[in-house]
């Protein structure tokens, strides 16, 4: 996945704590074991510091996962790592909710918080 696709813009309110929530209800990837498609919803919540993520670039970043054979846990942590590295937010969480396969669903969540 190419994190260099991600673009930022300046936070107009860097002195204020506020939360941005982004939901992608059409995320797709490929199961590395079976080669079958996986479908999920990705929710990103963050408190920006100096920058915010530009949504069109995030959409193209997500599309990079479409044909990638990657486990749910790896996707969730990869997105967090890439966004934290780029944004340097005050806090950020990624929640991935995966549609049922064989009657089983999975939700993976990971959190980051700046240390002062």
Curated annotation (Swiss-Prot):
Protein's name in the database: NADPH-dependent 7-cyano-7-deazaguanine reductase
Positions bound to substrate: 53-55, 72-73
Localization annotation: Cytoplasm
Catalytic reactions of this protein: 7-aminomethyl-7-carbaguanine + 2 NADP(+) = 7-cyano-7-deazaguanine + 2 NADPH + 3 H(+)
Pathway info: tRNA modification; tRNA-queuosine biosynthesis
Source organism (scientific name): Pelodictyon phaeoclathratiforme (strain DSM 5477 / BU-1)
Name of a matching Pfam family: QueF
Broad EC category: oxidoreductase
GO cellular component, one term: cytoplasm
UniProt entry keywords in alphabetical sequence: Cytoplasm, NADP, Oxidoreductase, Queuosine biosynthesis
Main location (coarse class): cytoplasm
Tagged with keyword rRNA processing: no
Entry-linked InterPro entries: GTP-CH-I_C/QueF, NADPH_dep_7-cyano-7-deazaG_red, QueF, QueF_type1
Recorded family membership: Belongs to the GTP cyclohydrolase I family. QueF type 1 subfamily.
Entry EC no(s): 1.7.1.13
GO biological process, one term: queuosine biosynthetic process
Function: Catalyzes the NADPH-dependent reduction of 7-cyano-7-deazaguanine (preQ0) to 7-aminomethyl-7-deazaguanine (preQ1).
Molecular function in Gene Ontology: preQ1 synthase activity
Superkingdom of origin organism: Bacteria
